[in-house]
Amino acid sequence: CSVYSWAVIIEKFRLFKKINKLSEEFEEKFWNSKSAENFYNSLPTNVEDPMALVFQGAMEGLLKKKSKTNLSERMTAMLEAGVEKQMTKIEKGFTFLATVGSTAPFIGLFGTVWGIMNSFQSIAISRNTSLAIVAPGIAEALFATALGLLAAIPAVVAYNKFNTDSQKYSQKLE
């Protein structure tokens, strides 16, 4: 769980770094172009930038429809659909991070209870409360707690950061 969590964190970190750079380049080229149609025609077919993909989808819809009726409504609908599609791709994996962040401490707590129960069981079997009898169960309990926190803390921090980054990027797209 923790390994996959770190894989998602690294992938999202790289993704946000990439799309922020691409969107800055897109905006600069867009505002320096003579017209939206000229800019659309200059875009490569294999665009990776979500902002460019939203623009491309809206322009394709605009250019394919010759009718000028309800143009504003159609453009709004196409842009909203494009933004939603790109944000769904960007936010993939967020639910996993949130789930790990919220459940890992409970799994660690379960391990803690299990370790404490083992300590009590050792005391009952040996009828002795020396450190040598109690320590293995306590160590097991602390280890389980640490593992739960080790999985949860990075997942929660990453989820919050990426959720904030996602909201900011969504506002840029809109």
Language model feature labels by segment:
Residues 12, 105-108, 148:
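Residue-level detector of functionally special positions within alpha-helical transmembrane segments
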Residues 17-111, 116-130, 157-174:
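Predominantly long cytosolic amphipathic alpha-helical stalk/bundle segments
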Residues 94-98, 138, 145:
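Short hydrophobic "helix-edge" motifs at membrane interfaces and signal-peptide entry regions
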Residues 127-141:
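Hydrophobic alpha-helical transmembrane segments and adjacent short intramembrane/lumenal linkers
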